[in-house]
Amino acid sequence: DKKEEGKYHPRIGVQRDFIFRSLSEAEKNAFNKLYDQYYYHRHNDFWRQQAMKKLPQLTQSTRMLVCGEDLGMIPDCVSSVMNDLRILSLEIQRMPKNPMYEFGYLNEYPYRSVCTISTHDMSTLRGWWEEDYLQTQRYYNTMLGHYGTAPTVATPDLCEEVVRNHLKSNSI
């Protein structure tokens, strides 16, 4: 804290900051344990209690299927709470939940999920296609199974193929 020396505040993604890189390996390991505990475990019971107090009223107030945006950094309890309340998971191929994958595999999505190409705070399919040519080239070859050079623009036929593949996913 710049105003109060000796005070520290948790910050998401601090591992990419210059100050983190200046730490020794032992300090980095200790920091990462604290970071993981704070962001993923410390508040887990609190989040579960709050969810179970508020969400049942919402999910039971309608006959619609409810979908949760379970993307990014989420507490460990989110998956079990969503399962207990029968809330559908959100799956986005270019934002896979498995950090080992660059893209999600549509055939691995759970049945109780919604599979979509993007969300309200992401670029459209055509916009994404033009953002990072190397990434779209990998998508074109690995996910769509095409050989050769990917088109630089997402053509209507290409977009239709991507949408068709999403519609064939395991998701509801």
Where are these regions (language model features)?
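Catalytic cores of glycan-processing enzymes that make or break glycosidic bonds
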Residues: D1-I172
